[in-house]
Design a protein with these regions (language model features):
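Carbohydrate-binding surface patches
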Residues: 296-334, 343-345, 375-379
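Structural recognition of the beta-strand scaffold that forms the well-ordered cores
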Residues: 9-13, 49-53, 93-96, 128-132, ...
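C-terminal accessory region downstream of the catalytic core in glycan-modifying enzymes
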Residues: 329-362
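Active-site cleft segment of glycoside hydrolase catalytic domains centered on the general acid/base Glu
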Residues: 17-128, 133-152, 176-180, 210
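Glycoside hydrolase catalytic-domain groove-lining segments
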Residues: 128, 135-195, 215
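Short, small-residue-biased leader/transition segments that mark boundaries at the very start
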Residues: 1-6
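C-terminal beta-strand-rich structural cap/linker in extracellular carbohydrate-active enzymes
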Residues: 356-386
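Aromatic/acidic polysaccharide-binding cleft in carbohydrate-active enzymes
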Residues: 170-303
Length: 386
């Protein structure tokens, strides 16, 4: 089982049934919902708001193997069972379909977008939130073209529903990312604790701390309501859930068992992406309104997102170019006691735990001008840390 936390709202769900031959078993449904009820109604985990029945059911790696009709049948069985417990049904709604964007299993009649559209047609009245997974390439996102794909999916969503990315990260199999893929493969050779089956070996790199907030900006500006970075901690997931330490999935912001299990204390250190991702999560909290932003000179190396939360403003900007960029920022309101955080490869202001510290505090601003270094990221906010 797995969960995705959106501040005080948790998506809880099944990865697959205990055995693949239980994929259409009502016994599995009964067991699963009984445990969900135990968590929510008996133990009081009221933070659980959504439930997902299969991980990536369109995948050829899933027990469903792209069988939409089987998945739909089970979706309605789970809904029926949840409905038998009024308190649970009031608290928890279904998240679906959890399919992988830009993917088509040859065994399935639908690609991911078609699966989403069919889910809306068949089951919108029982869906609480629409949920997708996304693993674009670096060139795709940095070129700005990924926003078109995001918009295509978002345009199908009914106006009274939200859409989120329940998993998001980067994969480098596309031709435009061939140099990154070559480096990925080089790092796998004789690696002591992964075979590279499902990893991002570049999650250790400084640039990943630019690419993840950039992806978040594109998702936020496309009208999505949240995304979860895959993943938090390398120690949480091995290939096939085997528990074997020689083949873990390396995607995280650290590995909490680096010393104890993997004989590498360095793996426990916070990776660069933690710096920027923690800031995005802190200053664009659940309930923030995302504002329309525009880069007036059409510069395709500067990306920005802005949000308002309880009257406080946050602006995040990333420069993915090779040159420093002068920016002049027009603000919709005065910022009082603003903080400035900067992510630069040679300038990462941190406390003793490695957590980000602002480089400026107490700023009072009606506008903002500065030079953003090449390959860097900033957050400007007057939202309190308290």
């Amino acid at each position: 089982q797995r969960q995705m936390c959106i501040r005080d709202r948790v998506i809880f769900g099944e990865y697959n049934p205990p055995t693949f031959d239980m994929k259409d078993s009502e016994k599995w449904v009964d067991m699963s919902v009984a445990y969900l009820k135990y968590l929510v109604c008996d133990l009081g985990f009221t933070c659980i708001k959504y439930f997902n029945i299969f991980n990536e059911p369109d995948g050829d790696w899933a027990s469903t193997n792209g069988d939409y009709l089987l998945w739909k049948k089970m979706l309605f069985l789970f809904h029926k069972k949840i409905s038998e417990y009024p308190m649970l049904a009031k608290q928890v709604k279904l998240a679906a379909p959890d399919v992988v964007m830009d993917y088509h299993n040859s065994n399935s009649e639908y690609d991911a977008e078609g699966w989403l559209m069919q889910t809306i047609a068949d089951a919108d009245d029982i869906i609480g939130v629409y949920d997708l997974h996304a693993y674009p390439g670096q060139a795709e996102v940095r070129s700005g073209s990924y926003s078109k794909l995001l918009a295509s999916y978002k345009n199908h969503i009914p106006s009274d529903k939200q859409i989120i990315l329940g998993e998001a990260g980067y994969k480098y199999w596309r031709t435009a990312d061939s140099l990154l893929m070559a480096e990925y493969n080089r790092r796998l050779v004789n690696h002591p604790y992964t075979k590279g089956t499902d990893c991002n070996m570049l999650c250790y790199d400084y640039f990943y701390g630019l690419d993840m907030p950039l992806l978040a900006m594109e998702v936020m500006n496309a009208g999505y309501s949240g995304l979860a970075m895959w993943m938090l901690d390398d120690a949480m997931h091995s290939n096939g859930d085997s528990g074997k330490p020689e083949d873990i999935k390396i995607w995280g912001m650290w590995n909490i068992l680096g010393e104890e299990v993997f004989n590498s204390p360095k793996e426990e250190e916070l990776r660069p992406s933690f710096y920027t991702w923690s800031l995005m999560c802190r200053y664009f909290p659940s309930g923030a309104d995302i504002l329309k932003t525009e880069v007036l000179d059409g510069n395709n190396e500067i990306y920005a997102v802005a949000g308002m939360y309880k009257g406080k403003l946050t602006v995040a900007i990333v420069n993915i170019g090779k040159e420093d960029k002068k920016i002049n920022l027009s603000l919709p309101k005065e910022m009082t006691s603003a903080l400035l955080y900067v992510y630069e490869e040679e300038h990462l202001n941190k406390d003793e735990n490695g957590f980000p510290l602002p480089v400026q505090t107490g700023m009072k601003l009606n506008s903002y001008s500065n030079t953003i270094k090449s390959n860097s990221f900033i957050i400007l906010t007057d939202l309190s840390d308290e």
